[in-house]
């Protein structure tokens, strides 16, 4: 069974950089999946942030966030990370990591989620 666990600061000041990590157990992040970050802002639906592909270093980002986002992975620690620069109050959200279906099999669903971490942007 795959388990994902987010970690990072609960609060960030405006204009600073948010860094979050998702630890993966029960699977290797080298595997053929898209390791994904998603967020839910207060009172809103889920917003896709981006993913990194386990089979290589291919990334894909939400165009509206692309200029501020970097997703990377550390195979030695079996985790992947999110970096979001120049944060503002609108980046306050619950941030989730998730495993999206196999790219080679063209699976289009999420099969594992972290519990989420609330990040507040405030001075």
Which functions belong to the PLM regions below?
Residues 1-123:
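Extracellular domains of the immunoglobulin superfamily
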């Amino acid at each position: 069974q795959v388990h994902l666990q987010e970690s990072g600061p609960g609060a960030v000041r405006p204009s600073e950089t948010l860094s979050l990590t998702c630890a993966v157990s029960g699977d290797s992040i080298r595997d053929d999946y898209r390791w994904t970050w998603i967020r839910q802002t207060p009172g809103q639906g889920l917003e896709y942030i981006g993913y990194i592909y386990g089979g290589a270093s291919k990334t894909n980002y939400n165009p509206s966030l692309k200029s501020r986002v970097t997703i990377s992975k550390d195979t030695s620690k079996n985790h992947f990370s999110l970096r979001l620069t120049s944060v503002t109050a609108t980046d306050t959200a619950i941030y989730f990591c998730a495993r999206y279906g196999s790219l080679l099999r063209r699976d289009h669903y999420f099969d594992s989620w972290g519990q989420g971490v609330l990040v507040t942007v405030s001075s």
